[in-house]
């Protein structure tokens, strides 16, 4: 309770001492701290703490109180624009007042981006006019340049966003490099592009006439993209070979040719034309159309049924089978009937194997479990 009372008295004295002068406060605090014998702090440390508390309480508007609390005043803010600082300096000298506050109250920084390239030309022109009218203080200009270089801001437009790779056709020369075929612009003046902001509207047309010639016209429409193109007929591709064969047959047999108005062929006509073409390729009186189809293994139509041209059902003869086996590369084995002895032997082997499997089942399971 005594320590709490002592602390309350200390805060009460601090509030009272805010109304007194600074010299009286120092002596009073020293006398008060000497009278306190139960405090754990030494005399010098206690006096230093109380002195700092009273000093901060009396001078709240000073930098000692504002900097630790992260309070930034207008005095800490430096001017950022060259033209605005010069205007503020002239007004301040005429009125006889401080110029730092007026410089801070100027308009904010204009950050040059890709969208503000057109407006950057007019801003740079105004800045150059202000520089031409006020060339008296060279020392102030150097200080402003140093300040802008340290802060990283500048009133001039950033050349990074200016399209230097595009030809501006204003007081500039072009040079062709070895690696690049397009002309590279060599600007002797950085503000050439921004001075001709009005002519930048017609820059794409000038570039097009420069690179592709005056006769080039960009008349491409959406209809050209969706223009219909005649495709290939799949039926004509499939029946191209059959038509060629039909023409060859007509040339060989002009009497058998029948005139047809339709170009498309049916399935029956397609098969007949193939059979006739096979007969024309291999003419032989003894061979029939079925035999020619069997002998030619690379033919695209196989035998559909065992009927002849008259519609009667006929089986294959043994000659055709022998011819087909000889022409094919399949290995044929002669069929031999099994004797009774072989049949009994197979049955005995099956029985023995079954008995062995039943006897050795227990041993196999035991070995598997181990």
From Swiss-Prot:
Record has Glycoprotein as a keyword: yes
Record region (Disordered): 81-101, 123-167
Ranges annotated as biased composition (Acidic residues): 139-148
Glycosylation sites: 59, 98, 126, 171, 221, 230, 262
Transmembrane helix in keyword set: no
Signal sequence coordinates: 1-27
Assigned keywords, A-Z: Glycoprotein, Signal
Domain of life of the native organism: Eukaryota
Name assigned to this protein: Putative uncharacterized protein YGR079W
Organism per entry: Saccharomyces cerevisiae (strain ATCC 204508 / S288c)
